[in-house]
Each structure stands twice: as C-alpha cells, then as structure tokens.
C-alpha cells in the first residue's frame, strides 16, 4: 500500500483525513473532492493493493488492506471510505481503534451479497452482471460508469476529462479479480458493535450497486451513526453532488 496523493496542510491544522477508494478505481477517484475540502486539512488518498500504482505481491485480503492503511496513520484520523473502501474502513476501525477518530462510509456495505439473514445484499446474478462489463473492457466501462454517475451534473464532461485518464490506470488485473472475490466473500457484520467512533453514512437514492437499504442496515447496527440519502445520487455521491457532499462531510468532521 502506498500513500499516493497527499495534500499538505497549513501549520495550524489538526485534522488528518484519509480517503479510501473502491473496487476497480484508484486514488484519483477523489481528485474532484479533495480541492473542496478545507485547505487546512492534510488529506491523503491511498491506492489499495494492486490498484493504481500500488504494488501487488500477495493475495488481496481486506484485513491486510486495512492494516496497511493503519500503518500510515500516526495520530487518530478521519477516514472516508467509498464502496469497497468503506469495507476496508470498517476493518480499520475495528482492528485499529486507536488510529480512527471518525468514519464516513459512502455507498458502502458490511456485506455485499444477500443471505437468508441479510436480504439487504445483492443477488449473485445481479452482481455478476455489473462486474462482468468491467472485466470485458475496463476503460470503456469505467467511462460509462462515470457518465451514468454524473448524468444531469453540471460540467460532467469536465469532471470526467479531469479524472478519467488517471482513473483508467486501474492496476493489476489479478489484483482486481482477487479484490472482487474478497469483497464478495467478506462479511463485516460481526464487527459493527465493536466500532465506537462517530459515523456518517452517505448513500445515493438511485444506487443499484449499494442501494440505500445497505446504508439502513449499517445505520441500525452502528451506534450513534447518522444516515444521509442523497435521493438523486447514485453510486458516487461525492462526484455527482460534490459541493453538497463536501459541505456535509466538512460539517461532520468539524463536529467530531
């Protein structure tokens, strides 16, 4: 795990923010969000193992990914995780509580696939159909994914133009497959009652990948959490509703 992009703070900054991307992406997914966060915050966006420029020398493991992020943190930090990155953030908070001051989980999950005791999850065929497109032609489908997320968003073409060239460098194919397999196997529900930090949950009302019911499950099981559903957003609220998302997150962190 490498800390790839870091924005230095002003001398009086006291908050450290770490941004953790989702499957099939890399740190550049946050390129449009970072400038909207307070200039006094030191913000680091990381690449998960095998994604972006991060090396991949072992099977992808959610717990190991969380440990790698923890190794970069020297004082309790505010963690924002998107999709798979939110799952990593849950493991980080449970395994390294001394490293986490607050959590923001956006379009994320404790478990991705449905089970008898977890109807909130996705049916396996639906999940397979969604990820199959990315496997067949990543560059094509990541652009289509962004276009769908930013539908009706002002300057959508500009946002896509800024982040797509770097985002399309998706990383190691074997790592992406292993990360997907790990996400499908993972079940962090048993960790939720161990997490004792402020939690903000932000979901998109139109998200078909991690629908709001997954956020409702997290909200019920993470004590003291706050759930916000952006009704017109889909799987990337921090892109499609960047200003509103940044303001929401800023107020949350400032209030911790």
Swiss-Prot record:
GO terms for molecular function: pimelyl-[acyl-carrier protein] methyl ester esterase activity. It is an enzyme of class 3 (hydrolase). The keyword Hydrolase applies. It is found in: Cytoplasm. InterPro entries: AB_hydrolase_1, AB_hydrolase_fold, AB_hydrolase_sf, BioH. Gene3D superfamilies: alpha/beta hydrolase. Its EC number is 3.1.1.85. One of its GO terms (cellular component) is membrane. The keyword Transcription regulation does not apply. Residues 17-241 form the AB hydrolase-1 domain. Transmembrane segments: none annotated. Keywords: Biotin biosynthesis, Cytoplasm, Hydrolase, Serine esterase. It catalyses: 6-carboxyhexanoyl-[ACP] methyl ester + H2O = 6-carboxyhexanoyl-[ACP] + methanol + H(+). GO terms for biological process: biotin biosynthetic process. Substrate binds at residues 23, 83-84, 145-149, 235. Pathway: Cofactor biosynthesis; biotin biosynthesis. Its main location: cytoplasm. Pfam families: Abhydrolase_1. The active site is at residues 83, 207, 235. PANTHER family: AB HYDROLASE SUPERFAMILY PROTEIN YCLE (PTHR43798:SF31), MONOACYLGLYCEROL LIPASE (PTHR43798). Belongs to the AB hydrolase superfamily. Carboxylesterase BioH family. Monomer. NCBIfam families: bioH. The physiological role of BioH is to remove the methyl group introduced by BioC when the pimeloyl moiety is complete. It allows to synthesize pimeloyl-ACP via the fatty acid synthetic pathway through the hydrolysis of the ester bonds of pimeloyl-ACP esters. This is Pimeloyl-[acyl-carrier protein] methyl ester esterase.
């Amino acid at each position: 795990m490498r800390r790839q992009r870091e924005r230095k703070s002003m001398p009086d900054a006291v908050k450290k923010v770490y941004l953790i991307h989702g499957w099939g992406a890399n740190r550049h997914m946050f390129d449009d969000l970072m400038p909207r966060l307070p200039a006094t915050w030191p913000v680091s966006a990381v690449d998960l193992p095998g994604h972006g420029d991060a090396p991949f020398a072992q099977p992808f493991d959610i717990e190991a990914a969380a440990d790698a992020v923890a190794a970069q943190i020297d004082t309790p930090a505010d963690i924002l995780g998107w999709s798979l990155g939110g799952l990593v953030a849950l493991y980080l908070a449970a395994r390294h509580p001394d490293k986490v001051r607050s959590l923001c989980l956006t379009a994320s999950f404790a478990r991705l696939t449905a089970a008898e005791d977890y109807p909130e999850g996705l049916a396996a065929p639906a999940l397979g159909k969604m990820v199959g497109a990315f496997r067949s032609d990543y560059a094509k489908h990541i652009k289509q994914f962004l276009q769908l997320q930013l539908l009706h968003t002002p300057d959508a073409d500009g946002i896509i133009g800024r982040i797509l060239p770097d985002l399309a460098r998706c990383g190691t194919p074997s790592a992406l497959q292993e990360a997907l397999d790990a996400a499908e196997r993972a079940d962090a529900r048993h960790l939720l009652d161990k997490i004792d930090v402020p939690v903000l949950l932000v979901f998109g009302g139109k998200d078909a990948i991690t629908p709001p019911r997954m956020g409702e499950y997290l909200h019920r099981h993470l004590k003291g959490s706050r759930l916000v559903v952006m009704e017109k957003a889909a799987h990337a609220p921090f892109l499609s509703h960047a200003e509103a998302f940044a303001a929401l997150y800023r107020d949350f962190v400032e209030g911790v």
